[in-house]
Design a protein with these regions (language model features):
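C-terminal catalytic histidine-bearing segment of alpha/beta-hydrolase fold enzymes
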Residues: 46, 55, 276-360
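A domain-start/cap signature at the N-terminus of enzymes
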Residues: 3-134, 301-302, 352-359
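Short glycine-enriched nucleophile-adjacent loop
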Residues: 230-241
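A catalytic-pocket lid/entrance helix-loop region that shapes and gates access to the active site
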Residues: 255-257, 264-284
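A conserved short beta-strand
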Residues: 243-256
Length: 360
């Protein structure tokens, strides 16, 4: 069988790609999941200045909060160099348009593919900023948009809510609906740190308590990368600047390269966990990474039966018939993002605030 982009991503039906106007902003639910309605965050109530004592800010009751926010620190637009070639990322022009010629020779234009700085943010209704929690940073794969794929098809916000774990989501738009894994600003030193820092006030607003920004600014981070999301995931581990705030890495059929960066993080960060689930498309690279780790004396598990602890390294092969396109919802189990979060939450050390996080 082939291993082309079309093999891994068979074209969906028209309805899958272009939902009707009246359902575009509705978060789709699995049949057995409780129904939730996405609501907008309530603005803070207007208050008149007073010398008298006032009650502390009370966060209004709310439901799941899911929205798109533009961030300067998101992956694109990106005007820097491609670190693989040390040449400008935008390496082709036509009139006033600038674009990027990919390794496969295809040209993608900045105004169509690399100009969306929006981030999908999600705060579950039961999230409590006063308790230990994590920020899940999700790097999507090729041929994706945040609404159609990450939210509605892969159900990443819903998986986080359904896990019951005290977690929020940040999912930056990478190359829009393109066969391109470029990391943009996540290639840059400190890129992930700036991204999470800029997100803090927006997450606090979505949560309904502006005072929660400090907690979000110091919260531990879990990186999830699907397919082509391996590039920003790897570079975020290598140069992202978050140090031991990154408590876990979960790759979904995503080990297509950057093995040295993943191996280095695993060897040097024994306080976090690493999980890679894979199909035949990435099996060769996963096996190569396993061998690299064994040579460094790292113990490897080959199933998800046990708990996730600091230092856990797990590689899970999934059988034939499990498709790459549906892997974010159907891997070794249904809703694997939910499964990993549940196993992570059973180990308090993984969600405890890192020492010195406020200054990291």
């Amino acid at each position: 069988m082939g291993d082309s982009f079309d093999d891994r991503f068979p074209k969906p039906q028209f309805r899958d790609r272009f939902p009707a106007a009246n359902e575009s902003f509705v978060q789709r639910q699995s049949p057995d999941a409780p129904r939730r309605r996405t609501a907008q965050a309530e603005p803070a109530p207007y208050q008149v200045a007073s010398l008298a004592p006032t009650a502390p800010y009370q966060r209004p009751a709310r439901e799941d909060q899911t929205t798109l926010v533009s961030l300067k620190s998101s992956a694109f637009p990106y005007l820097g160099n491609n670190p693989r070639t040390d040449e400008p990322f935008l390496n082709i022009s036509k009139g006033d348009r600038r674009g990027h010629r990919s390794y496969g020779g295809r040209v993608y234009w900045q105004d169509e593919t690399y100009n969306d700085n929006r981030v999908l943010m999600h705060v579950p209704e039961n999230f409590d900023v006063r308790k230990p929690g994590v920020i899940v940073v999700f790097f999507h794969g090729n041929g994706a948009t945040l609404e159609r794929d990450v939210r509605d098809r892969q159900l990443v916000p819903q998986q986080i809510s359904d896990s019951g774990v005290n977690a929020v989501l940040l999912a930056p738009q990478l190359a829009v609906d393109a066969a391109d894994s470029s990391a943009g600003k996540f290639w840059q030193p400190g890129g992930l740190k700036r991204f999470v820092a800029e997100s803090a006030e927006h997450l606090a607003g979505l949560y309904g308590d502006p005072g929660a920004a400090k907690a979000f600014a110091n919260m531990p981070v879990i990186i999830v990368g699907y397919s082509g999301g391996f590039v920003p995931a790897a570079w975020s581990l290598e140069v992202g600047g978050l140090g031991n705030r990154v408590r876990g890495v979960f790759l979904l059929d995503a080990v297509y390269g950057e093995l040295d960066k993943f191996a280095s993080w695993i060897v040097n960060n024994r306080s976090g966990f690493f999980v890679s689930a894979y199909t035949r498309y990435t099996k060769r690279h996963d096996n190569e990474l396993v061998q690299m780790l064994k040579e460094k004396g790292i113990a490897i598990s080959e199933d998800m039966d046990g708990p996730l602890r600091p230092g856990s390294v797990v590689f899970v092969e999934t059988p034939e018939g499990v498709t790459h396109r549906d892997y974010v919802t159907h891997a070794w189990t249904e809703n694997p993002v939910k499964e990993v979060l549940v196993k992570m939450a059973a180990t308090p050390a993984l969600t405890r605030m890192a020492a010195g996080a406020a200054s990291s």
